[in-house]
């Protein structure tokens, strides 16, 4: 198959690449590219990387993003480089184990490898795409990625959702902390200590003891402070733009869409709701406790299955009006049944999910992008492009239906960017069962998504708001 047309960078992508290069010229150890999902961060990054003198580059990214990186590099028309593409799950292969080990279990050896191992080789340029994945400094992937970044001359961090709370940004310590902690190759402990000192100096949160015990109460003053440090201050370490700030870029259009329940589905839903209320009461009345959270998850999964027919009917209408439809779901069983239901209606449908190989998922994605599928049902939240006009045959209007509401602003923002991206508009429909607690949850989510700035605390605030809605409804009905 012949390659797609040559990629032409847009002005905002050139601006991003110039900001990255300016940080490099200023001697900074890295840069945070925080543009919202759909603004083409991959091409922005590659424009900058291709202009740097180093030939060898390590790109660490989600497995599903590897095809996009390959496509961007192939179609950008820029000088070739020696690029190693590595997904997060394979990063341990980058490390050599310590000379002596007494660990016996696989888990213990892997932890030791990530913490005490040394890089088998060093790349001068490192990219960490979807960098929020390494926000836990004690995770195996986080430890390895931070070591590779520490050994590099320059590291580019890419994430539209850098962290839910300020202390989750410790992976950016070398960029944020002045002085010795920014020196190439220093220990990771110095990074965390330096970041801890920064948080204490700024009076943000409680940074005492082990990282997992750090805490923070969302507030606007801290959000403004972090925004200043990350993106808006004169010495900001990164760049972040929203789609509506880009000239000619379509704004996100969100709609809440009620789906009807027939008599039997209504009976099942109400029985499921009663069972949830009973379990929640036994759990102390809060979804923020482990038992309450588990009860909430069971309720959402059962509700997801009950609503399949309504979502299929809604997708019927969209496809019948000449559109292609991407449907986001949270559960594999829902995915399989939705595909079966829509195929039964005569549509060409397939799925993208974590049970399939990367090659299979990419084949489904390409079929959708070429217009060979009417709908695709997907469980992933990041690293795939399902927007209109990427390939010949994919010119139909697109709609995104969120069948399963996530209780995370970060996940929802990532999901929204699967279709509404690269300057292509896609209406985003949040589906819910009418006359149920889901109606108020959907309204709460839409309101908060419209106002969110993607900075620290958005995800926590949304989770608390949704929990409040559910708990209030459980007590009242």
Identify what each model region corresponds to.
Residues 381-414, 418, 422:
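Conserved RecA-like helicase motor core of SF1/SF2 enzymes
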Residues 324-328, 337, 343-380:
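Conserved helicase ATPase core of P-loop NTP-dependent helicases/translocases
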Residues 242-348:
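Conserved helicase/translocase motor-coupling segment
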Residues 125, 142-245, 425:
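Conserved P-loop NTPase motor "coupling/switch" region that bridges the ATPase
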Residues 42-75, 163-168, 330-333:
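Conserved Walker A/P-loop ATP-binding site and its immediately adjacent core
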Residues 407-477:
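A conserved SF2-helicase RecA2
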Residues 1-32:
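Conserved pre-motif I regulatory segment
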Residues 27-47:
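Walker A/P-loop
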């Amino acid at each position: 198959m012949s390659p797609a047309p040559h990629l032409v960078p847009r002005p905002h992508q050139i601006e991003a690449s110039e900001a990255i290069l300016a940080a490099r010229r200023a001697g900074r150890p890295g840069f945070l590219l925080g543009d919202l999902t759909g603004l083409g961060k991959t091409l922005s990054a590659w424009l900058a990387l291709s202009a740097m003198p180093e030939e060898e580059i390590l790109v660490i990214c989600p497995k599903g993003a590897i095809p996009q990186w390959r496509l961007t590099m192939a179609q950008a028309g820029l000088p070739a480089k020696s690029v190693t593409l590595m997904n997060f799950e394979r990063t341990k292969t980058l490390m050599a184990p310590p000379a002596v080990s007494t660990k016996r279990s696989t888990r213990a050896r892997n932890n030791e490898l990530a913490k005490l191992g040394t890089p088998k080789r060093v790349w001068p340029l490192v990219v960490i795409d979807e960098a929020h994945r390494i926000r836990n400094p004690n995770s195996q992937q986080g430890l390895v990625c931070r070591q590779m970044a520490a050994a590099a001359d320059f590291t580019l961090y890419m994430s539209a959702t850098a962290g839910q709370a300020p202390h989750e940004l410790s992976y950016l310590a070398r960029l944020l902390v002045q002085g010795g902690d920014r020196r190439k190759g220093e220990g990771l402990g110095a990074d965390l200590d330096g970041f801890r000192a920064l948080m204490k100096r700024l009076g943000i949160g409680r940074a005492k003891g082990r990282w997992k015990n750090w805490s923070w109460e969302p507030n606007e003053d801290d959000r403004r402070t972090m925004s200043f440090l990350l993106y808006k201050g004169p010495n900001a370490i990164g760049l972040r733009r929203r789609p509506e700030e880009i000239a000619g870029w379509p704004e996100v259009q969100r709609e809440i869409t009620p789906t009807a329940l027939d008599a039997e589905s209504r009976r099942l839903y109400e029985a499921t709701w009663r069972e949830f209320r009973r379990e929640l009461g036994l759990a102390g009345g809060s979804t923020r406790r482990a038992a309450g959270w588990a009860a909430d998850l069971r309720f959402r999964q059962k509700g997801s299955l009950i609503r399949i027919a309504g979502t299929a009917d809604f997708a019927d209408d969209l496809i019948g009006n000449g559109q292609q439809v991407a449907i986001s779901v949270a559960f594999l069983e829902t995915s399989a049944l939705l595909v079966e239901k829509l195929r039964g209606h005569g549509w060409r449908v397939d799925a993208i999910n974590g049970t399939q190989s990367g090659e299979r998922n990419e084949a489904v994605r390409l079929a959708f992008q070429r217009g060979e599928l009417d709908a695709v049902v997907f469980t992933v939240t990041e690293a795939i492009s399902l927007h209109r006009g990427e390939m010949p045959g994919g010119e139909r209007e697109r709609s995104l239906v969120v069948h399963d509401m996530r209780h995370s602003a970060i996940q929802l923002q990532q999901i929204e960017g699967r279709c509404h991206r690269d300057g292509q508009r896609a209406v985003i429909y949040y589906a819910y069962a009418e006359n149920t607690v889901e109606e108020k949850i959907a309204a709460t989510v839409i309101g908060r998504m419209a106002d969110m700035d993607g900075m620290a605390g958005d995800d926590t605030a949304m989770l608390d708001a949704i929990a409040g809605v559910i708990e209030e409804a459980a007590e009242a009905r």
